[in-house]
Swiss-Prot record:
Positions of post-translational N6-acetyllysine modification: K151, K157, K164, K203, K219, K223, K233
CDD domains registered for this protein in UniProt: GATase1_ES1
The keyword Mitochondrion appears for this protein: yes
Organismal lineage: Eukaryota, Metazoa, Chordata, Craniata, Vertebrata
Coiled coil region boundaries: none
Organism of derivation: Homo sapiens
Main subcellular location: mitochondrion
Record protein name field: Glutamine amidotransferase-like class 1 domain-containing protein 3, mitochondrial
Length: 268
């Protein structure tokens, strides 16, 4: 009986040793080590706002959609805006200027940023992997004079500096809605989209912007609202957003396409 017990014990020990090994003779701890991966570093994205409200600042739905998609993509976001007066203040219930009222772009943008915002003068491309500009008339009124001067517009000096810094560093830039005119003005020859080039019965009410973009020396690429155009050479990604009169979820989807492409171009 003693001999039997010894034989059984030896076989159990052998079986235990066998089951503790995977093919190739690895223990469970060794197998686990093979599945460990180093977390990918988060892309650091600068979001540049132009106020708060579609007619005199940032289009709020666009800014929110960008933030949601950046969050889903695991990005670290820092929000910026220039510390300058707005061109004017619009009463959004009437769509008309509020006479005698003035507001600051940085202060108004802080509403969207929930107070966590930095002066655009402090934005350096060296500290970020990408920059994104939502639309809204603030891009054409506060970040530039496009709303008044069209193709002869001037771009805010800090906005121009930021666009050039990111471009020269080979870091991606995302712009949606009317904001692509900023890239068209500053980065000559860039490819952008603001959607279609004909109004098509009011579906594309700002289609004339495409001609102004061409007049600035940029290339306009026709895209649907759910699409994003990628200028691979310049690493500029654009989507029409509210340049199109359509359901909000389509605009959200197009912005998602833009954000995903921007994050892909960061390589993170």
């Amino acid at each position: 009986m003693a001999a039997v017990r010894v034989l059984v014990a030896s076989r159990l020990a052998a079986a235990s040793a066998f089951t503790s090994l995977s093919p190739g003779g690895r223990t469970p701890s060794q197998r686990a080590a093979l599945h460990l991966s180093v977390p990918r570093p988060a892309a650091r994205v600068a979001l540049v706002l132009s106020g708060c409200g579609v007619y005199d600042g940032t289009e709020i739905h666009e800014a929110s959609a960008i933030l949601v998609h950046l969050s889903r993509g695991g990005a670290e976001v820092q929000i910026f805006a220039p510390d300058v007066p707005q061109m004017h203040v619009i009463d959004h219930t009437k769509g008309q200027p509020s006479e005698g009222e003035s507001r600051n772009v940085l202060t108004e943008s802080a509403r969207i940023a929930r107070g966590k915002i930095t002066d655009l003068a402090n934005l350096s491309a060296a500290n970020h992997d990408a920059a994104i500009f939502p639309g809204g008339f603030g891009a054409a009124k506060n970040l530039s004079t496009f709303a008044v001067d069209g193709k002869d517009c001037k771009v805010n000096k800090e906005v121009e500096r930021v666009l050039k810094e990111f471009h020269q560093a080979g870091k991606p830039i995302g712009l949606c809605c009317i904001a692509p005119v900023l890239a068209a003005k500053v980065l000559r020859g860039v490819e952008v989209t603001v959607g279609h080039e004909q109004e098509e019965g009011g579906k594309w009410p700002y289609a004339g912007t495409a001609e102004a973009i061409k007049a600035l020396g940029a290339k306009h690429c026709v895209k649907e609202v759910v699409e994003a155009h990628v200028d691979q050479k310049n690493k500029v990604v654009t989507t029409p957003a509210f340049m199109c009169e359509t359901a909000l979820h389509y605009i959200h989807d197009g912005i998602g396409a833009m954000v995903r492409k921007v994050l892909e171009l960061t390589g993170k």
